[in-house]
């Protein structure tokens, strides 16, 4: 049977989380790594956004947003996984956390990590704003830490999947500093879970 096709870029956090969800959902795809400076014509023709990740299903349906790819992956996994990774009683909280990451945190992360790409940007201000959000997430992890390991509820959820690649980028951008300056122990262990997971090298 014809495989689904995923256009991806290895270091892109949106693409990382899409690949993670597909891997966790045991959905096999034909992975096509993209040179962002020389995008393939098929991607340009197919995608309105003209960027990654882009999933083309074997029936021709196109899914462009990473969160939509994640939700599609879950909908095509078993019912137990759907309830585990997006439990109905925490769905709104999970989706709101993802929105906070995708809108607010990424806005400040980009202007801290890539400050030379923006005009009149105060790098330190955006670092502080990103760090404040990190602290909020760390407090959520710490609150749950004695009972479990996750941002929301008792199990790993798509909130964890969606946010950890961006926290990793923040850590990389701060690599000249001691990690304990901006991450407390729960956040360090949470991120370490993903970076040392057997799936990590696969995605």
Residues covered by each model-derived region:
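Charged/polar, low-hydrophobicity segments characteristic of intrinsically disordered regions
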Residues: 111-113, 193-203
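GST superfamily/GST-like fold recognition
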Residues: 151-176, 194
